[in-house]
Amino acid sequence: MHTELIRQSYRPSHIRLLLVGESPPASKKFFYVKSAMTKHTAQAFKKAHGASFRDDEDFLHYFKRCGCYLDDLCHNPVDDLSKPKREERLKASIDGLAQRIREMNPSVLAIALKRIERYVQEAVHRSGRQPRVFVLPFAGNGHQTKYVDQLREILCTYVPAKT
């Protein structure tokens, strides 16, 4: 199934927390299919809400029930591009993300990769919306614990547990 159809199937009607990543990876293991980021995000929810999940699918349904959604700055993979091409593609994606933020109107937005902060901040500005914005470290490359702990803090404050 196409990544955007999969992503849309997990979109809640009201988005409380919007996580923004860079792009789905070229490997096809993106958040809503099977990725390490899914597992680390589930770990933050377990710590914040005392929840347990049978598997990734169970977690993703809980994530949706909590009003959480993951979108990407760019909907096409950029991790296999040269740095100049990647930058070009990310800059070209700002207006699209701004439009989606305007339409979703999240209360909280968490940028899930520090290096895309300037693009996402510009998209937030162009959207005309004013969510509380947080920047998380990437959920890999040795930063998993920081990602989980910082996301847990956001969840404890802004995202109530669901049953």
Model-derived segments and spans:
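A polyanion-binding, active-site-adjacent surface
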Residues: 1-139
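A polyampholytic, Gly/Pro-enriched intrinsically disordered region
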Residues: 150-163
